[in-house]
């Protein structure tokens, strides 16, 4: 009896003609070989035949279609990057500074009114178990140059660790004794996380006397002149709702991972934020280092925790109300980059999942809005959301980490040189403009960004389809000076599960296999990229990135 009796029940005549039609482009010997393999009792031969059929009918056509799709996305992304580069070049060449387009006058004491001529400003500092950085951030906020009777420092502490909460309270009491108008606010719960804390902070009675609110995360240290540089724009330009400053990183040189993060974020601020501000007066609020007009914030519905990007959510809703934003590139606020890989992964998950989920929830409102021009809607939906928050992540992982390596295994699937090499190189060089002094790290940055693309692709799917950890909010760990002072214990025996990321290792193995296959059977030099990229995935997969901080060394 045949080991595969089901094959003998198939209509052999029909199937034979099908095989012949598939192989008609080949020789008659090939066709006969196909038929003989099908009629054979050898299970290996039949499996091989079925694979050849599936490869010819399904796999290769699918990959060819995906390559075409990726080529289209590559061109779209290149055009987007070129457009942003041209805008920034125009802004730089013609020195189109904010002061040229928005009225700005320095704040001075009125002879008759004195400090009463200054508007009331609320400074909010949300915190959660951040004892390593709370003192420096509170101190920086309390040193802001502004009349003491026209500013309120509001520390919103959601800490669950008694030691952290006590330290924050002591710091607030210390500055209060020095004459600073500072309040220490706590909640019974953490509903809404950061958005919930900010929302509760705005409900206090003393906030009603304030005109503007400046927001700084716990690791941010504004310069004393921060309000003097931002508030005048809001005073003299009633259509402005937000003035955003740029992040500057005090620990950028701490390790390779922080240097690579600095490159990405420098591009975000130098190019993306500046383009949005210069063209459509719209960009995503960065959640910190910015000043809001309180009336605009309230008119837009206040803080909403429907997504994990409450800052971007508020920016979109304010724009739909007709408000404008201003970004000041040379207004730098010191902050800290995540130096542990665990913290970076949590941050990148939130920064990718949140915008995708926000697009899902707000796209309809953007389209229907009557306060936004057609071109601005196009910019918001296409450039801001679709290209930068969706296509960029899909293209990076699917094309460069899955489809391009697969062309080694399927020679029938070809990728033009301009798409495989020239276009990505141009895009990378354009992105590198944001941080020219780090251009020598460009190759490492490309490999690291590709390795991180798997995490971002997963987060993107969660956000778009609202599944899994779509509402997960993990506060990015800040270490302040603890690494320098060695307050974090060195733990030589690290638990394996804390470091290993299985999916990254699987992708690394896939790339390694493709690279070796290309060396043995290939006719190009794609293996050079594949082998280096596989190493990057293995490094990320085994957690050999950044400063390792054991879970027991900081508070969750």
Curated annotation (Swiss-Prot):
> What is the documented disruption phenotype for this protein?
Embryonic lethality when homozygous due to defective pollen tube growth and disruption of embryonic development.
Q: Which UniProt keywords apply?
A: Cell wall biogenesis/degradation, Glycosyltransferase, Golgi apparatus, Membrane, Transferase, Transmembrane, Transmembrane helix
Tissues expressing this chain: Ubiquitous.
What's an example GO BP annotation here?
embryo development ending in seed dormancy
Catalysed reactions, as listed in the record: GDP-mannose + (glucomannan)n = GDP + (glucomannan)n+1
The family line of this record is:
Belongs to the glycosyltransferase 2 family. Plant cellulose synthase-like A subfamily.
Q: What is this protein called?
A: Glucomannan 4-beta-mannosyltransferase 7
Q: Which organism is it from?
A: Arabidopsis thaliana
The gene behind this protein is CSLA7
């Amino acid at each position: 009896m045949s080991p595969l009796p089901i094959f003998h029940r198939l209509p052999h005549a029909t199937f034979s003609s099908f095989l012949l039609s598939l192989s008609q482009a080949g020789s008659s010997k090939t066709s006969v070989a196909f038929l003989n393999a099908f009629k054979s009792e050898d299970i290996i031969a039949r499996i091989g035949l079925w694979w050849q059929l599936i490869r010819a009918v399904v796999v290769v056509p699918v990959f060819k279609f995906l390559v075409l799709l990726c080529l289209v996305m590559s061109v779209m992304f290149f055009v987007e990057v070129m457009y942003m580069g041209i805008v920034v070049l125009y802004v730089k060449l013609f020195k189109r500074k904010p002061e040229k387009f928005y009225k700005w006058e320095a704040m001075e004491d009125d002879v008759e009114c004195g400090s009463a001529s200054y508007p009331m400003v609320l400074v909010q500092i949300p915190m959660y178990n951040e004892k390593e950085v709370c003192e420096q951030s509170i101190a920086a906020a309390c040193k802001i140059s502004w009349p003491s009777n026209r500013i309120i420092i509001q520390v919103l502490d959601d800490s669950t660790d008694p030691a952290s909460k006590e330290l924050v309270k002591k710091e607030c009491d210390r500055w209060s004794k020095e004459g600073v108008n500072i309040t220490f606010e706590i909640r019974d719960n953490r509903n809404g996380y950061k958005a919930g804390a900010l929302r509760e902070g705005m409900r206090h009675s003393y906030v009603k006397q304030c005109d503007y609110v400046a927001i700084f995360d716990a690791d941010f240290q504004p310069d004393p002149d921060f309000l003097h540089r931002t508030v005048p724009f809001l005073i003299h330009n009633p259509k402005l709702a937000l003035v955003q400053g740029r992040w500057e990183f005090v620990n950028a040189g701490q390790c390779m991972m922080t240097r690579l993060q600095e490159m990405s974020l420098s591009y975000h601020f130098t190019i993306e934020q500046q383009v949005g501000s210069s063209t459509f007066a719209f960009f995503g609020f960065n959640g910190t280092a910015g000043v809001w007009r309180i009336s605009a914030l309230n008119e837009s519905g206040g803080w909403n925790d429907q997504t994990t990007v409450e800052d971007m959510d508020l920016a979109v809703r304010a724009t739909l109300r007709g408000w404008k934003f201003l970004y000041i590139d040379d207004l730098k606020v010191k902050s800290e980059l995540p130096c542990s890989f665990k913290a970076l992964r949590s941050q990148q998950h939130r920064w990718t999942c949140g915008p995708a989920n926000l697009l899902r929830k707000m796209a309809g409102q953007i389209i229907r809005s009557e306060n936004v021009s057609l071109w601005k809607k196009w910019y918001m939906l296409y450039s801001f959301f679709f290209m930068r928050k969706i296509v960029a992540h899909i293209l990076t992982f699917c094309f460069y980490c899955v489809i391009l390596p697969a062309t080694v295994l399927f020679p029938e699937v070809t990728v033009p040189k301009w798409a495989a090499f020239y276009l990505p190189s141009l895009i990378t060089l354009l992105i590198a403009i944001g941080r020219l002094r780090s251009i020598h790290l460009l190759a490492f940055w490309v490999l690291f960004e590709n390795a991180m693309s798997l995490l971002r692709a997963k987060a993107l799917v969660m956000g778009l389809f609202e599944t899994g950890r779509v509402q997960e909010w993990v506060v990015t760990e800040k270490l302040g000076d603890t690494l320098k002072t060695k307050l974090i214990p060195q733990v030589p025996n690290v638990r394996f599960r804390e470091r290993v990321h299985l999916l990254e290792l699987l992708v690394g193995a896939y790339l390694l296999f493709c690279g070796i296959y290309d060396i043995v059977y290939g006719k190009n030099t794609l293996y050079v990229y594949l082998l280096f990229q596989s190493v990057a995935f293995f490094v990320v997969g085994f957690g050999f990135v950044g400063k390792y901080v054991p879970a027991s060394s900081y508070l969750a």
